[in-house]
């Protein structure tokens, strides 16, 4: 099966929302080889495929992408991020690059995919993979976005979660709150401003809020 070097997004939630798109690639006869932030390697470990980190250091990242283009049996690159920089890195890395026509990068894409209308990010990533497969002359294995993300956990992930639950005496009913999105999107603040207001109502119905703030 031909290998496609897939550039993952830079955030945990977005990486998870790529999973149906990656499953579509695999089901359609392609082998996804993943490239992304180093922390994503552990997140995607359950997929069992190749992962190579990029760290935001231009010369090192470019050397790694060129090495992969020459030695990982791949000439195709698929971009899930919208950024100009992600497209430029793959292009300079000598990959045939496919991605959305965003961030004024159309001229460096080998296969530019028209932007879809407003949709959930899961559907947007799925659309990217679906259109890419067709641009490569293949037929997508399915056209409907799966209902579940289906993140595959390793035994060590489950053990680590169990240890945290025991260490911090987390009750059986809990909700994870992750107020980490920053910046603006289309002129609007991305982060939800009401996490503090959500804590008390959750506790009132017997659900303990567990907050995972950003480290940065």
Residue ranges of predicted features:
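Catalytic machinery of carbohydrate-active enzymes
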Residues: 1-216
């Amino acid at each position: 099966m031909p290998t496609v070097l897939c550039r993952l997004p830079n955030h945990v939630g977005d990486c998870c929302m790529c999973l149906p798109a990656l499953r579509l690639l695999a089901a359609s006869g392609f082998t996804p080889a993943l490239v992304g932030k180093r922390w994503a390697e552990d997140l995607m470990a359950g997929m069992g495929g190749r992962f190579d980190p990029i760290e935001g250091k231009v010369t090192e990242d470019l050397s790694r992408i060129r090495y992969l283009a020459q030695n990982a049996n791949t000439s195709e690159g698929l971009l899930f991020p919208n950024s100009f920089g992600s497209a430029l890195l793959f292009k300079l890395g000598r990959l045939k690059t496919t991605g959305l026509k965003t961030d004024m990068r159309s001229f460096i894409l080998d296969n530019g995919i028209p932007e879809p209308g407003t949709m959930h990010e899961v559907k947007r990533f799925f659309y990217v993979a679906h259109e890419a497969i067709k641009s490569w002359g293949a037929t997508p294995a399915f056209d409907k976005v799966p209902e579940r993300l289906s993140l595959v956990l390793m035994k060590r992930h489950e053990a680590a979660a169990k240890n945290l639950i025991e260490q911090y005496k987390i009750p059986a009913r809990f909700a994870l709150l992750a107020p980490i999105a920053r910046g603006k999107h289309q002129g609007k603040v991305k982060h939800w401003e009401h996490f503090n207001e959500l804590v008390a109502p959750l506790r009132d119905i017997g659900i303990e809020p567990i907050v995972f703030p950003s480290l940065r």
